[in-house]
Amino acid sequence: MNHNTPPTEEIAFEGRIGEIVHAKQPDGRIFEYYRRPPGVRLVIVTPDNKILVTKEHRRETGGIDLRLPGGKVRDTLEEYHQLLASGQDMTQAAAEAAAKEALEETGLIISSPQLLTRANAGATVEWDLYYFLVEQHQESQHGQELEQGEDIEVAYLTPAEVRKAVTKGEMQEWRSVGVLLGMVLPRLEQSA
């Protein structure tokens, strides 16, 4: 169960998509954190500056949530460890996952995704989200390719509608809200 962890780390628990890590500090204390495969989020923008969002029922919110489309860079912890061991660039792996998720969730074939930022979850959770801006896309003739059990509706919102959805609490993935409000909407509103 080593997974090439540094000598100061010990895996205390390993699940299907994450693990509890005990990291020994220089003073001997143990710092515990949770690590899981990183994820991707897509900021898909149309020529008329609308942003694609998905509407889906989310277990964690207990209702419908507006979200940026996306998913995991790798589906399991084992696949994530294999990716790390391969030496492949994580940003490149994230861009490939972004293309896969775009097709599955939105039915769009994307090209030239541009990394906006990598947002971390905080000190006690290692779960980065790679945000990609996508301005070049076309519809797949097959439409969405949803996984079993997924029910995802696609909508296009203006920057003003995105702000309203955030204010009303309809978008609850707060890292995505931060990226939208801090990086994306100012750019779109400036170019309008």
Residue ranges of each PLM-predicted region?
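Acidic, metal-coordinating catalytic segment for phosphate/diphosphate chemistry
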Residues: 6-48, 56
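Nudix hydrolase/Nudix homology domain
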Residues: 6, 64, 70-71, 123-124, ...
